[in-house]
């Protein structure tokens, strides 16, 4: 308790931590908790199981409590940033709602960006809820630009999400990343008119007074939201005219200038550079902290930690809510209506509730992105940016929004790019460094070569069911086609997985497959061997963990594996990411991951706490054709086996190339073993039993000690001489001069 209290953690939280047998903070907690309590943005990286969740949960809970306590007692914070509310008093481009390389002139109307590689955007200070309105934009040079309208939820990259409507100089209209031909190209000296008829739900544009016709019909999900003038530039300059000056091409058909819009139609921007007065009132659906997790299991795990840490906090009590898919939204909404302080959720359901206004982000004090590299790899960067844009940068008590990003590695380019975009001078806490394999992990590769191992020909139909990628191909023996070898690889991998389990008499292992259908097929094959979910204690008892399984089933399966009811957990990378599973002796990679960092994440699940672990990777020597769904339904009901470049949903997967990238990343050569999967024991390990601690006694260090012995003896003699000299100088002051 004292150790956490010394970092400034309040006694109530320290007491809860002590009851969890956390006597001392872990390294990541000791570094991060004081930084977060001090008000800074923090980027942290540490291994799974290092206490990373506690490192952000503890300070977040404490500051949320202190904020609520201050509100309860009527205290008001003092803003640390000069107010910018004056910009809302007229129609102009908003200096508090723009990209980092977007410049705005002193009049608020002339805008430019000289960035040649990236787009940078901006929105106006005001938007509209009703009426028929118009503004003009003049192009001052030949750079690239898009102009139009967007809601406050939209990305500043206009037209790349479902909340913005753009018209670009290349003659394309854009909405939700769909770029369609529209009107004409425009460039320097052209004037573009932007029309908005909210009552009819129409958006259109004109060029030099020529009406280009209807561009967009406003979809239902944003009909009740204010639309703001917006633009995005790449090495371009524009000048806006909202009606304060005479229009070059005055609008017709009842459209009026934005500057003439009645006050009842106008909505001011949330981005003012300071907290809004309206945010100070209590809103039940406006949490103080938002924690985003990439999977349901991680979200549940984090929520449980929050509940444990805050159990002794009272007056006011903290209210938390889990927002994940697969659960009735009705239940979550009823909790929101009663008030919530901390929300933990996954992107899909969070996006639904935020976009419909059911979850209000106006009072968020903390934004935590856990496993940020996982969130980005799943394609949630637009969601993160859109959500961040909706959160005021200064809260109602005058404090700055704090952003905390946790990642398995901070060396990812995408994570670095995200941090530059949404964080304010973050402190990097990197206790992981470059990826490496712990010395308690023995990892080997088993080459799967269908040309030398012809077992697949002799199995007939008694093999694992494959993923139907080759359902329309000739894969019969003798075809000698890439498709035949690919199908043979899939069959052999099922056999090798069974062989590895039998050879090493595995009693517990995590088995990683590339796709959900691969997981299901391997589970079915284990059931053919007599195992499966309902065969407790059987050699092939197993459960599955992936996104298509129902939430309660996933939770139940994970618990059964942890308790030892079943021996094997068959899962995908996404489902298993960050899950707290300790002491597993074996990992089998049925397919290598397409991201080299994930290889380290996978095999790092064995060999913890000085226990030896074995990771076996089945690596195809030939290319394998696999699913790679780019369709809108993400693979559900998809049978398009054409290659991605031909408009299909498959790719050729080159595991030998992936293996070389992993070896280069780890700066080592991974040992290869024969298809019989007999793994030779490394000489420094002695006799190894995977899952048990390495034999103590220091035998591994004997040679090292022998080498250092002479140096240590010399150091001891020097220490003795120094101590003797000190005693003579301190207590026998005349001794020094007796020799003279």
From Swiss-Prot:
Broad class of where this protein is predominantly found: nucleus
Crosslinked positions (Glycyl lysine isopeptide (Lys-Gly) (interchain with G-Cter in SUMO2)): 281
Localization in the cell: Nucleus; Cytoplasm; Cytoplasmic granule; Cytoplasm, Cytosol
Region named Necessary for interaction with RELA: 1-525
Binding site for ATP: 46-53
UniProt GO BP: defense response to virus; double-strand break repair; innate immune response; mRNA processing; positive regulation of canonical NF-kappaB signal transduction; positive regulation of myeloid dendritic cell cytokine production; protein localization to cytoplasmic stress granule; response to exogenous dsRNA
Domain Helicase C-terminal positions: 493-681
Annotated positions of the N6-acetyllysine modification: 239, 268, 281
Protein name: ATP-dependent RNA helicase DDX1
């Amino acid at each position: 308790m004292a150790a956490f209290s010394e970092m400034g953690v309040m006694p109530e939280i320290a007491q809860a931590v002590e009851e969890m047998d956390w006597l001392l903070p872990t390294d990541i907690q000791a570094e991060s908790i004081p930084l977060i309590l001090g008000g800074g943005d923090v980027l942290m990286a540490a291994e799974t199981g290092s206490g990373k969740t506690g490192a952000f949960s503890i300070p977040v809970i404490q500051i949320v409590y202190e904020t609520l306590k201050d509100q309860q007692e009527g205290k008001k914070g003092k803003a640390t940033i000069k107010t910018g509310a004056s910009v809302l008093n007229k129609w102009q481009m908003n200096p508090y709602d723009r990209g980092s390389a977007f410049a705005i002139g002193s009049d608020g109307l002339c805008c430019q960006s000289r960035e040649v590689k990236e787009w940078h955007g901006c929105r106006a200070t005001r938007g509209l809820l009703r009426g028929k309105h118009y503004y003009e934009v003049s192009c001052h040079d030949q750079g690239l630009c898009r102009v139009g309208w967007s809601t406050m939820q939209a990305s500043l990259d206009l037209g790349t999400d479902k909340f913005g409507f753009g018209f670009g100089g290349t003659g394309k209209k854009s909405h939700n990343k769909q770029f369609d031909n529209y009107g004409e190209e425009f460039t320097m000296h052209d004037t573009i008119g932007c029309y908005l008829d909210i009552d009819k739900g129409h958006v259109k544009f004109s060029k030099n007074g020529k009406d280009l016709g209807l561009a967009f019909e406003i979809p239902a999900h944003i009909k009740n939201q204010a639309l703001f003038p917006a633009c995005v530039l790449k090495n371009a300059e524009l000048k806006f005219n909202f009606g304060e000056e005479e229009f070059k091409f005055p609008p017709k058909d009842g459209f009026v200038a934005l500057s003439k819009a009645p006050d009842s139609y106008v909505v001011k921007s949330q981005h003012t550079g300071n907290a809004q007065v309206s945010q100070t009132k209590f809103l039940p659906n406006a949490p103080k902290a938002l924690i985003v997790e990439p999977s349901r299991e991680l979200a549940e795990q984090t929520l449980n930690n929050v509940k444990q840490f805050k159990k002794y906090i009272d007056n006011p009590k903290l209210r938390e809510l889990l927002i994940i898919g697969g659960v009735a939204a009705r239940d979550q909404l009823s909790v929101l209506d009663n008030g919530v302080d901390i929300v933990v959720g996954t992107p899909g359901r969070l996006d639904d509730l935020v976009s419909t206004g059911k979850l209000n982000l106006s009072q968020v004090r903390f934004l935590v992105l856990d496993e940020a590299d996982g969130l980005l790899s799943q394609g949630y960067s637009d969601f993160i940016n859109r959500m961040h844009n909706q959160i005021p940068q200064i809260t109602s008590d005058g404090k700055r929004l704090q952003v905390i990003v946790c990642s398995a590695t901070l060396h990812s380019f995408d994570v670095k790019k995200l941090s530059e975009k949404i964080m304010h001078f973050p402190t990097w806490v990197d206790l992981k460094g470059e990826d490496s394999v712990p010395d308690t992990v023995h990892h080997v590769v088993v080459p799967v070569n269908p040309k030398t191992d012809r077992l697949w020909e002799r199995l007939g139909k008694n093999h694992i069911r494959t993923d139907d990628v080759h359902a329309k191909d000739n894969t019969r023996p003798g075809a000698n086609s890439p498709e035949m070898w690919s199908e043979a690889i899939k069959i052999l991998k099922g056999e090798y997985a069974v062989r590895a389990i039998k050879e090493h008499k595995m009693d517990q292992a995590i088995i990683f497959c590339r796709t959900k259908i691969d997981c299901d097929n391997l589970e079915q094959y284990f059931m053919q061997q007599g195992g499966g979910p309902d065969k407790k204690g059987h050699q092939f008892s197993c459960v599955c963990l992936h996104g298509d399984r129902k939430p309660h089933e996933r939770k139940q399966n994970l618990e059964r594996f942890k308790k030892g009811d079943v021996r094997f957990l068959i899962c995908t990378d996404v489902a298993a990411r960050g899950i707290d599973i300790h002491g597993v002796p074996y990992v089998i990679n049925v397919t290598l991951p397409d991201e080299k960092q994930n290889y380290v994440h996978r095999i790092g699940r064995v060999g913890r706490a000085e226990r030896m672990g074995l990771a076996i990777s089945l690596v195809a020597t030939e290319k394998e054709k696999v699913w790679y769904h780019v369709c809108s339904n993400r693979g559900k009901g998809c049978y398009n086996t054409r290659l991605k470049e031909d408009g299909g949903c498959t790719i050729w997967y080159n595991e030998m190339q992936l293996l070389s990238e992993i070896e280069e990343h780890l700066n080592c050569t991974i040992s290869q073993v024969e298809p019989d999967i007999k793994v030779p024991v490394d000489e420094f390990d002695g006799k190894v039993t995977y899952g048990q601690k390495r034999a103590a006694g220091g035998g591994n260090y004997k040679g090292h000690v022998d080498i250092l012995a002479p140096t240590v003896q010399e150091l001891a003699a020097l220490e003795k001489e120094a101590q003797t000299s000190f005693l003579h100088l301190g207590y026998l002051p005349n001794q020094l001069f007796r020799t003279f």
